Amino acid sequence: MNGLNVLLTGACGRIGKTFFEASKERYRFTLTDRLTPDFDVGEHRFVHADLSDKTRLAALLDGIDVIVHLSGIPHASASFDALLPNNILATTYLFEAAVAAGVKRLVFASSAQTIEGYPVDRQITPGMPVMPANLYGVSKCYGEALCGYYAAKTPLSTIALRIGAFEFTETHELNNARDLSAWLSPRDAVQLLQRSVDAEGVKHLIAHGISNNRFKRLDLSETTRVLGYQPLDDAFETFKIPITY
């Protein structure tokens, strides 16, 4: 282990479980979710918690160096009523508590839905304005704005990861060129998260979370330069799906 104490929210989700299983010998984890893990947490700590209850956060963050915040409603069709407690309030409370606890960095799971309003044939480059196509994307834009605010006004380092279409190769829902161009493979997701936790000298970054796909919905040049991210997988080679738009 490298000595870092990491709070992983949404630990029972697909990305959370994948990251934990690949990194459990690398970090000391406090895992949290409203669900019960279906995997062995071993020597690590698991705490049932609803992050929209701010009274739970101080105890969760005691001794934590880095937060990897994956929890929240992940559905593009989610309503505002569902998003408000889970994606807006819980995220706000977590940032507030992180600063109060002296956490060094918060890695926020944003989404490619923040830019889904752009035409599918337009690559998203760093600095382009957000253009969400649904309220879920709006909630992730809010999280990105929190990252910028807290990085500017407090000692907290923040990295927002615009995660694309995370899918396992055996069971996936990639159906067209748009999906393939945004694919993030499990092993590339692990690498991206580890590099985000470990990176030195980064105060604030909005990074792009996709694999090394032949056609890329999101440009990876800045993410590669700042984090040293070197994705290994290509959806077009891996899945060989006939390309439709």
Question: Model-predicted segments: where are they?
Answer:
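NAD(P)H-binding glycine-rich loop region in Rossmannoid oxidoreductase-like domains
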Residues: 38, 49-86
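N-terminal Rossmann NAD(P)H-binding glycine-rich loop of SDR-like oxidoreductase domains
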Residues: 4-25
